[in-house]
Amino acid sequence: MTIQLTDEQLMIRDMVRDFAREVVAPEAAERDHSKKFPGDILKQMGELGLMGMMIPPEYGGSGADTVSYVLALSEIAAACASTAVVMSVQNSIVCESLLHYGTEAQKERFLKPLAQGDRIGAFALTEPDAGSDPVS
């Protein structure tokens, strides 16, 4: 199967690659070593439309397709795996769940600040009587 990237997908990939190399990568090892949360970088990523990529524009997102999202995530991951995990959870678990399963009031209240990087979502998992280990 051959996938031909569109001009827009290539533009997104290149923009994120430049951002990742110039902003994310330079202090990635130090952030990981010191366990510093990359809040300032995530805010910049929100301003670039990377924190709610597949969320429709009417909710503050970029309205990007899945291929564009994966290309962007791959470029962030190449620069810093932990920053990519935050981006992935924000886009895939938090924003997508709200978009598909949230009420209209929840979408209006939460999606725009999440998609624009003003708020960071979280993932929690419980399994009664079984324990949970989402890392493994």
Predicted features along the sequence, with ranges:
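Intrinsic disorder at enzyme termini
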Residues: 1-10
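A non-catalytic, amphipathic alpha-helix used as a structural packing/dimerization or gating element
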Residues: 11-22
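Glycine-rich flavin
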Residues: 23-136
